[in-house]
Each structure stands twice: as C-alpha cells, then as structure tokens.
Amino acid sequence: MSDYLPVIGITMGDATGIGPEVIVKSLAHDSVRAQCRPLVIGDVRRLEVAGRLVGSPLKLRAIQAPEEARFQSGTIDCIDLGLIPEGLPFGKLSAVAGDAAFRYIERAVALTRDEKIDAICTAPLNKEALHAGGHKFPGHTEMLAYLTGTPEVSMMLVAPKLRVIHVTTHIGLLDAIRKIEPGLVQRTIERGHQTLQRAGIAAPRIGVCGINPHAGENGLFGHGEEEEKIIPAVEALRARGRDVEGPLPADTLFYRAGRGDFDLVVAMYHDQGHGPVKVLGLEAGVNITVGLPVIRTSVDHGTAFDIAGKGIADERSLLEALRQGAELATRRA
C-alpha cells in the first residue's frame, strides 16, 4: 500500500445537529492524522462553538483553499464558507443550516473535480432542513449523484462483520418493488463487486436477498418477483464468473453473512438492509456511495437533534468513515 496520505474533505453537515461536535472530537484522535490529511469544509465559528462544548484543545484555522492548509497536529484546517449566523440554536430545524449543508457538499465536489482533495467524508444532514433550504434531494446519495452528473449510484453500508449494498433506497416500498428489475440488480451487484475488489477482496462472495418472505418459497409468496426481477441478474453474473448466490431469504442470509459466509449482502430495499446493519454497528457503521467518480464515505447516523449541542455525541462512526475513506483513496492513488 502507498505511503501517500490522502486529503479528505470533511463536510460539516447540518450545523444544528451533532456534525460539528463529532468532527471536532474525531480530529483530536492521533489515528486520523496517521491515515489522512483532514480538511473540514464548513464554518469555523460553528466548529469553535462545538470545540468549547466538547472541551477540545484543538485550534481552528480559517482558510479559503486547500493550498493554504498546514495539516498540523493540534489544529483543524477549515475552508470557511461563513454561512451560519452566530447564535443559531442546536437541535432545531433551520433552512439556513439546510442550505449550508448543500453548499458544503457543492464545494467538496468542486474540489474533488479539481483534484484538490482525494475523497469526501460527510457529517450528517437533515433532509427536512435540506428541503426547507430549497434543495429537494432525498439525501446525500442523490445529491452527490446530481452534482457529479452520475445517472446511477448505490448505497453501501458497512458495519463490523457486515457489508450491505442496496438496489433501491429512499423511495416507498411499493415504488421500490416496481423499480427493481434485472438490469438494476445486476448493475448494483457489479458496483459492489468492483468496490470490494478495490478494497482488497479479490473474489468477493455475494449473497442476494429475495423480496418476499422466504424469497418467495418457490412461488408460494408474492407474485413471482424473485423469478422475474432477481434470478436473471444472478444467472447472468454467475455466467461471468461472479461468486453470487441467491435470491435467498433475507433473515437467514444476514445470519450467514454475520458469521462470515459472504463478503457482501445485496438488499432489495432500504429497511431490508438498514435494519441489520444498525443492529450490529450503529456507532461504527459507515455509508459508502458506490458508483460516483469521487470517493465518498459518511457516518451511518443522523443529525440527532435530541442530543445536539450537549457535547455527548459519539464520534466512532466518523472515525471509521475517515479510516475507510482514507483506505479507498490510498488504494486508488
């Protein structure tokens, strides 16, 4: 592996949530600077407030471009967009914070396009605030696809002992079932396969969930969705030499994946994949957007308005997101 330390752009997320706190806490860990050169994209004054809340000894440096960053121990370099007014309360929905969260991502994408940073790691945003700020995206994943001009991406969640990629995400269950078709299933699995290979797994073992209980039980449950929507994709991939098994009942598949039988589980819809991951590792879970022209990792939790501003937010998910983002960027380099 290369000795290169990638520059990771950390977007601050929603300023009224726990994002500023977990960023300041994370960057106090020496392990982060051993893995990457962190560069926050957000608001210095908000990070200073968060630093006081958590008792951080780190100093903030406001800069306007990555070239100005020093990446010194004891200091946080922040590209300061200056969008958050002083005194904005924590834990309350804000259209200003929602718009700012979009602007941080927009700047991060521009910096990756200009090859000024090597990867993006995102703190959480609030979807309602994002919409109130005028940006009608379901979440980070769809926003990044739009900003990079990528027609199709996938969400992969990673937790201790489990990786899950989703065929569909932020749509209703009926819409998800209608959207699932062999081409989408096949492309999703291929994106997951390629991502795991880049992470060092030469021949990923992939298990594919069914849609119905018991994966349809040979047609007893549902209306033949497994036969129509999933099996053709699995057969096509197996013909190309991919190690793919399914469709399998989701409950037993996740059990088998947890004991190490599979490197990746393919979930058909949002809650099918999110539930098991969050049971196994909410604090250390990571969200990776697969299929973008840039590397993007994220915490696997929300803005936690109920505890925002109290200085008690857990930074472990961001630490893991930074570690995985740095690893992917280093392998690409």
Swiss-Prot record:
One of its GO terms (molecular function) is NAD binding. It catalyses: 4-O-phospho-D-threonate + NAD(+) = dihydroxyacetone phosphate + CO2 + NADH. InterPro entries: PdxA_fam (IPR005255). Catalyzes the NAD-dependent oxidation and subsequent decarboxylation of D-threonate 4-phosphate to produce dihydroxyacetone phosphate (DHAP). Can also use 4-hydroxy-L-threonine 4-phosphate as substrate. Binds 1 divalent metal cation per subunit. Its EC number is 1.1.1.408. It comes from Cupriavidus necator (strain ATCC 17699 / DSM 428 / KCTC 22496 / NCIMB 10442 / H16 / Stanier 337). Belongs to the PdxA family. PdxA2 subfamily. The gene is pdxA2. It comes from the Bacteria. Transmembrane segments: none annotated. This is D-threonate 4-phosphate dehydrogenase. Keywords: Carbohydrate metabolism, Metal-binding, NAD, Oxidoreductase. Homodimer. The keyword NAD applies. Substrate binds at H140, T141, K278, N287, R296. A divalent metal cation binds at H170, H214, H270. Its cofactor is a divalent metal cation. The keyword NAD applies. Pfam families: PdxA (PF04166).
